[in-house]
Amino acid sequence: MQTMSSGIARPVLFLTAREGEYVLKDEFQLGSSSRSTPQITGSPLDPNTPVKRLFFMRINIAQFSRWDYPYPREYIEELKKIHGVHHVEENRDVPSILENYRNSKRKSHNFSSSNTPYLKLHRPASRAGAPLINAKSFISSLTFHDNIVRSFQPSIHGKTFVFANHEKSFYWLDVSAANSHSALLKMEFPRASPVCHDINSFTKSPKGLDVIIGFDTGDVLWYDPINFKYLRFNKNGQLNSSSVTAIKWVAGKDSQFLVSFRNGWLVLYDKYRHEQPLHIVVPEKNLKSLYLSSPGTFNILISINHRDDRKLNPVACYAFSKSPINGFCFSPDYQYLALVSERGTLKLFDFVKEHVLDVFHSYFAGLTCVTWSPDGKFIAIGGKDDLVSIYSFPLRKLVARCQGHKSWVTDVIFDAWRCDDDNYRIASVGLDRKLLLWDFSVSAIHRPKSAVYYVNHHSNNSKPAISDFDDVGDLTMGSEIDNSNYVNGDITIHPTLSRSLIPVISPITIYDVDDSPLSSVFFDPDCMITCATNGRIRTWQRP
């Protein structure tokens, strides 16, 4: 039996890989939202049955090798009081999240920015008196644990913070603290569900953290959990009312971040800029040219190079298609983006030049997740075809398919600490509750015999199937074909290739990590972290 820091005794759980055993080190169980999700009844085959959209729990980690910036108790107590407005660059007013509960009962406070929401602090339930929830607030309550002061004390062993979105709540946990399994902070949202978030590694310091959170309502929240500040963007969907699907900071920038939406838009924001009322109306006759334009597989609604003397948001805005963008990932040099869509396309986008380079298609169905290798040579994607597919970025082609999942793949990631010049470690999780580890070696990949036959017997006049042109452009069929790829200007549309033409990789490890579907997997130098849709976070000690 194993006793965890949480005091829970359980049988030792481990998974075996080539390098040794990953042993379950600890686990955290996030509670359910106080507002339960309504149950949807009816047959999934009935077109009148409402569709319940799945929002997976996602995590991000902020690590500090040393924590030598102590916050005295007096500082925390001061934060609990009403202390007006924080001031940041460009005259943008930022309200404090924390307010003294005793002095804030049903009081109204006016901030100089009319768009900033008002929030009351709600103490833990053990405190006498039920919290008063302001139904009009975007954030209904914020609860912080008493050990938040202890977590801010200096430590030579460093700090590891985990941020997680689950159901209608957002959590901040200190997983480096022994015998502590309570969230330092928990934010609850009455009318929105956080679906994704990201941490700015460029500005990360013990004095402040920049966290951005995307919601199913289209809202975006910038949040500094250390200084207790926040700002809200795309309020009530004023620019885009569809759900956020993914969100990332632009590397090397202290204020810019990218947001993708279910309507196929990708929007660049700056946290220091105000939002302008922007209404883009596209006539019905121009819809086809907007989403299926021959100069590219997208339309630039606002260019990143456009002149803006007023410095307003959005900085840039692109419409890639009418199909939801399910995820995107920056290349290590941050010049390129890989985007995956519900239509089943992988698009390689030059973020600097605002140009689509290549379009690939899944074996079938939508794509759900994407990641880039640490050296930028390979892209791994997961999808609803139960496959993990590996693409070579320099060669612009599909090089291998990883077969082993029995349901949708929900997350895929390269283990940067197990990758070198020729060997790569990939981890994936899915709705089948399984974690799969894959070892991918470039020199060990061999083309099937059927692939050699295909290359030798296909003429240069062969064309991709008509289905391959869905969501990629209003193309002229007379354009040049080279090696069965459709070239339109500088854009290459790659047809779907049969499984018999692509090498298949088998997993080195298959493990049932949880009794609920898995949503995320994450690596750090010392451990691997897995997340399940039931709110359970598990850390696995590396061999």
From Swiss-Prot:
Keywords: Cytoplasm, Nucleus, Phosphoprotein, Repeat, WD repeat. The keyword Cytoplasm applies. The modification Phosphoserine is found at residue 43. GO terms for biological process: carbon catabolite repression of transcription. SMART domains: WD40 (SM00320). It is found in: Nucleus; Cytoplasm; Cell tip. It comes from the Eukaryota. Its main location: nucleus. WD repeats lie at residues 239-279, 320-361, 362-401, 404-448, 513-542. GO terms for cellular component: cell division site; cell tip; cytosol; nucleus. It holds the Pfam family ANAPC4_WD40. Interacts with ubp9 and bun107. Required for the ubp9 recruitment to septa and cell tips but also for its enzymatic activity at these specific locations. PANTHER family: AT02583P, WD REPEAT PROTEIN. This is UBP9-binding protein bun62. It comes from Schizosaccharomyces pombe (strain 972 / ATCC 24843).
